[in-house]
């Protein structure tokens, strides 16, 4: 299996199979995050994805769920995500659901119709690290987007009927920004 930036996953994905389709983080500028500091962002070549899917199939594990690796696999274009799902179905034809991390701005390049289509294909969850809903905290932490972007993109997810979860970092505002962050 190809894992160039290690495995990072939410606790509830512990039983999932992991497939690297990107490595590192496309933004990689958040002040608090060290997960991907040593891993430049890159997209896994199709050959590596095929090799990993072949290895999963050969293991005999009847995988039910895949959690895509990399901080931002949903930054990939709709057509690339479709191709990845086609490969998953080719190698694991019994049907699996797929989720992964995504930045809020990574779904900006996808229409509601494309998000609906991704859901129908089997992509059923994006985990967004929003961290805060306060613009001052988002700016201080160098997230690269604002609360209005969060609302806009998650509303698009709602309209598409695609599930998501969010990571909120309690205490991120510290003493100076704590009240705005908490509210």
Identify the role of each PLM range.
Residues 4-47:
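Canonical Radical SAM [4Fe-4S] cluster-binding loop centered on the CxxxCxxC motif
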Residues 19-21, 100-102, 166:
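Conserved hydrophobic beta-strand within the GNAT/NAT acetyltransferase core sheet
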Residues 37-40, 73, 133-135, 170-174:
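A short, flexible beta-alpha/helix-coil linker loop
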Residues 40-46, 101-108, 173-181:
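Active-site mouth loops of central-metabolism enzymes
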Residues 44-60:
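Short microdomains enriched in Cys/His and/or Lys/Arg
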Residues 47-48, 80, 149, 181:
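An acidic, carboxylate-rich microenvironment
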Residues 57-152, 159:
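Conserved SAM/AdoMet-binding glycine-rich loop
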Residues 125, 148-183:
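Conserved C-terminal portion of the radical SAM core fold
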